[in-house]
Amino acid sequence: MNSGMTGTIMLPDGSKVWLNSNTHIKYPSEFAQDRREVELNGEAYFSVERDPNRKFIVHSVEDQVTIEVLGTDFNVDAYKDNGFVSATLISGSIRLSYVNAEKEKRCLLMRPEDKVIYDRVQKNVDMCKTDVERDISWRDGTILLRDTPLDEVLWTLSKCFNVEFEVRGDHLRSCSFTGAVSYTHLRAHETLRHL
């Protein structure tokens, strides 16, 4: 998906994928008989068609993180330039596999409202309950903020508008924001003004 745009695609098995700005997904024109595999660089929301005979597997680019499901709804944020990969489970269950700092393969079973964040540098994970609505608000062209630090707000705007921000003054970094802004018909500076 191009910068500043979001969109949806239908995969060969009927699964639907919402793609966030600057997201790339690779998949075959036809899935194998025993598995359905895609490779993701960016952020995507998956609504996977249930198929008990074929796992659905998402590989994050340049990482040793995979997500396996049979049929469920989940969001993955795996931009290769991020220092992390995160997965948020909306419904069903998923198994997230990763390789830790000792090069051992580890697996976590996620339940609805769980969020896992894999640190690409430290090669460890943190799992917690999350605000699912906030994590997937980008699908509707909305930025949903709940006591969100400035750095996170600017990162989100960077993804939406393909711009970079410079913060002058460390006192601003301690600011946090709460609210909702629809950005589909706004420019970056207009969105900032609404915040």
Residue ranges and their predicted role:
Residues 1-187, 193:
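A residue-level detector for the "anchor" residue at the start of short, highly conserved motifs
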